Amino acid sequence: MNPRPLIGITMGDPVGIGPEIILTALAGTSVYEKCRPLVIGDPGVLGQAMAVAGYAPVIHMTDTPETGVYRPGTISMFSPAPPLSPVTWGEPTPETGGAMEAWITTAVDMAMAGAISAMVTCPINKEALKMAGSAFAGHTEMLAMRTGTNRYAMMLAGNRLRVVLVTIHTALQNVPGLLSVDAIADTILLTVESLKQRFGMNAPRVAVAGLNPHAGEGGLFGDEEARLITPAIEAARRKTEAAITGPWPPDTVFVKAAAGDFDAVVCMYHDQGLIPFKLLHFEDGVNTTLGLPIIRTSVDHGTAYDIAGTGRADCRSLTAAIDMAIDQAACLGKRPAA
């Protein structure tokens, strides 16, 4: 058995920075020393990005992950969609949107079949998905549907802060109506389970943020803390011995978490968690989907059309996502036999 896990890396939006950061992340030897990276995407687009990235490896096309060539200076690729190149950086089309979805579903199917240990995704463009007629708003929903998963959550993780979201992509005005005792408690428990199983923590410490200023200030600024969040915390505590505390005032809980007091913070809505997270981990943060039967990590940034094709893209988030996928594969014992 090859000791290095096989990691499928989807190219993401082919007219964004995905192709460039793949090239720069795979330049050198460090990634190859830890895993076998298989790029799922368009070889012509990757070739087009070589002039931008300043790195021109050999592209090895493979029909299966097992027959790839995994050594520095060579990038093994699998291409399940019609050729795209040449593309125009920063200009999505229905064809680029369709290719993105094909690459993602292929990686999911490979992971579900055990052909790869984990999948790592580069950023996609939701507008291009819509142009292609996709029914999905983004990665998380697509992965959940493809794997038949109803219970899932988004975690953003770095070495100083981890946040998990109860609600994800929805208008702020809709958040209070989407919160429930069951939804909050389930997110808390999923966070605890994932910290144990995928991050190797025996006794995780989870903080739960309030929704309102000062966590409601005893009902002066809202009743969601008393009506929903506190009962959810109590319900979660009945099902686990992990340390679950809260509801914490949102303006202070992240300070304590960044200081090492908590292993993760459960947040009520998207920007509550992502603003503090990106202040600390804008360059090296990782998005990982909890609850899936497969391992999926991702960069925590977008397609960056404004710098696509300029050679200025930073690959640190992708490198961190690859490292996290490797670590999760080790924790879960997911490794192809090849």
UniProtKB/Swiss-Prot annotation:
Keywords: Cobalt, Cytoplasm, Magnesium, Metal-binding, NAD, NADP, Oxidoreductase, Pyridoxine biosynthesis, Zinc
Amino-acid positions noted as binding substrate in the UniProt annotation, renumbered to this chain: 139-140, 278, 287, 296
E.C. number(s) listed in UniProt: 1.1.1.262
Highest taxon, organism lineage: Bacteria
Note describing how the cofactor binds: Binds 1 divalent metal cation per subunit. Can use ions such as Zn(2+), Mg(2+) or Co(2+).
A GO-annotated cellular component: cytoplasm
Positions with a binding annotation for a divalent metal cation: 169, 214, 270
GO molecular function: 4-hydroxythreonine-4-phosphate dehydrogenase activity; metal ion binding; NAD binding
InterPro entries named in the record: PdxA, PdxA_fam
Main function: Catalyzes the NAD(P)-dependent oxidation of 4-(phosphooxy)-L-threonine (HTP) into 2-amino-3-oxo-4-(phosphooxy)butyric acid which spontaneously decarboxylates to form 3-amino-2-oxopropyl phosphate (AHAP).
Family affiliation: Belongs to the PdxA family.
Self-association state and partner proteins as the record states: Homodimer.
Name assigned to this protein: 4-hydroxythreonine-4-phosphate dehydrogenase
Organism: Desulfosudis oleivorans (strain DSM 6200 / JCM 39069 / Hxd3) (Desulfococcus oleovorans)
Lineage: Bacteria, Pseudomonadati, Thermodesulfobacteriota, Desulfobacteria, Desulfobacterales
Underlying gene: pdxA
